């Protein structure tokens, strides 16, 4: 009997949906074992009420991508939890908040002001800010109410498994689907990952060439020159987060001469990506002068170390208690 699958996108961009579609013929093969009963709002012509009408626990597997940003997102993930036996936080936004989680460094009022009033491309002479309720003649229009901060979905519901990536690489998605179909899943609460760091699968890794990693003697930003395509980006001074990031992507960014920014999420059992990253960087900076360079070139280091994981960070949860 085919496993029933539901896919829900909440506060995200749809890239994780496309990662599933990118399975191409592998997705066709998987459909011999899976019955997709719901996929919204991107792929199937269904309504949220269709999900709400399904019997509780009637769906074997629910994939949720995107973070929780408003009350509609919050309601829908609760409905998914009610209807699905297994929930997977699919992609880094669902797992840890993702890039939209950077909004947690600002108040909602500041975000709205910058988006709708101060933006150089916005024509809004009356300084109108969207409201949850607006009346147009005899009609009352509503928008989902913003929450005070971005949340990963496990702050709203219990999550069974996590998958990193922005989006997850389609090869890894295929392995996730296979694990689900065969029932070869890790313990509940685990990340579904190969357990390797980006550095472990990166051809630039000095260890692969029989060399040792050097201390970083200079900190560079990506626009400061063109990195040597053969040498480790960290050894060249670029702030690559490969040592602390799950490598299920196959080191795609270093392959095209771009530093790893950490979208794969932390390597288990690490709980806080940013803390692990600063610990790793601190161990390879050559001296205090290099540390000063780091602080000068990255004055808001939080935006680098927590680019994909701020809502799931320990410090974020402490601040919002």
Curated annotation (Swiss-Prot):
Question: Which regions form coiled coils?
Answer: none
Write the Enzyme Commission number(s) for this entry: 1.12.99.-
Keywords, sorted A to Z:
Cytoplasm, Oxidoreductase
**A GO term from the CC aspect:** cytoplasm
> What Pfam families does this protein's entry cite?
Oxidored_q6 (PF01058)
Domain of life, per UniProt, equals Archaea
The question of whether Oxidoreductase is a record keyword is answered with yes
Q: Which GO terms describe its molecular function?
A: iron-sulfur cluster binding; oxidoreductase activity
**What subcellular locations does the record give?**
Cytoplasm
Give the record's family classification.
Belongs to the [NiFe]/[NiFeSe] hydrogenase small subunit family.
- Assembly behavior: The F420-non-reducing hydrogenase is composed of three subunits; MvhA, MvhD and MvhG. It forms a complex with the heterodisulfide reductase (Hdr).
Stored PANTHER family: COENZYME F420-REDUCING HYDROGENASE, GAMMA SUBUNIT, F420-NON-REDUCING HYDROGENASE VHU SUBUNIT G
Provide the protein name: F420-non-reducing hydrogenase iron-sulfur subunit G
Q: Which organism is it from?
A: Archaeoglobus profundus (strain DSM 5631 / JCM 9629 / NBRC 100127 / Av18)
Q: What gene is behind this protein?
A: mvhG
């Amino acid at each position: 009997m085919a496993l029933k699958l539901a896919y829900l996108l909440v506060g995200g961009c749809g890239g994780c949906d496309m990662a599933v579609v990118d399975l191409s013929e592998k997705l066709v093969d998987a459909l011999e074992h899976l019955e997709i009963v719901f996929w919204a709002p991107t792929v199937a012509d269904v309504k949220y009420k269709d999900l709400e009408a399904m019997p509780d626990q009637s769906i074997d597997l629910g994939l949720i991508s995107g973070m929780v940003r408003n009350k509609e997102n919050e309601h829908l993930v609760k409905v998914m939890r009610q209807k699905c036996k297994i929930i997977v936080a699919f992609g880094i936004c669902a797992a840890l908040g993702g890039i939209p989680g950077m909004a947690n460094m600002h108040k909602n009022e500041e975000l709205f002001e910058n988006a709708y009033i101060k933006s150089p491309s916005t024509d809004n002479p009356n300084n109108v800010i969207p409201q949850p309720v607006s009346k147009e003649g005899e009609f009352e229009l509503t928008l989902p109410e913003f929450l005070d901060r971005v949340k990963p979905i496990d702050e709203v519901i219990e999550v069974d498994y996590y998958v990193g990536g922005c989006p997850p690489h389609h090869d890894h998605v295929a392995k996730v689907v296979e694990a689900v179909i065969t029932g070869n899943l890790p313990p509940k609460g685990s990340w579904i990952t190969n357990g390797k760091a980006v550095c472990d699968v990166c051809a630039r890794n000095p260890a692969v060439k029989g060399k040792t990693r050097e201390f970083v003697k200079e900190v560079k930003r990506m626009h400061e020159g063109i990195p040597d395509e053969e040498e480790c980006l960290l050894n060249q001074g670029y702030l690559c987060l490969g040592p602390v990031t799950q490598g299920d992507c196959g080191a795609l960014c270093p392959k095209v001469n771009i530093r790893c920014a950490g979208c794969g999420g932390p390597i288990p059992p690490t709980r806080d990506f940013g803390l692990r990253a600063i610990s790793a960087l601190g161990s390879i900076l050559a001296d205090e002068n290099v540390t000063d360079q780091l602080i000068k070139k990255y004055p808001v280091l939080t935006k680098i170390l927590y680019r994909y994981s701020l809502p799931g960070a320990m410090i974020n949860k402490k601040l919002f208690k």
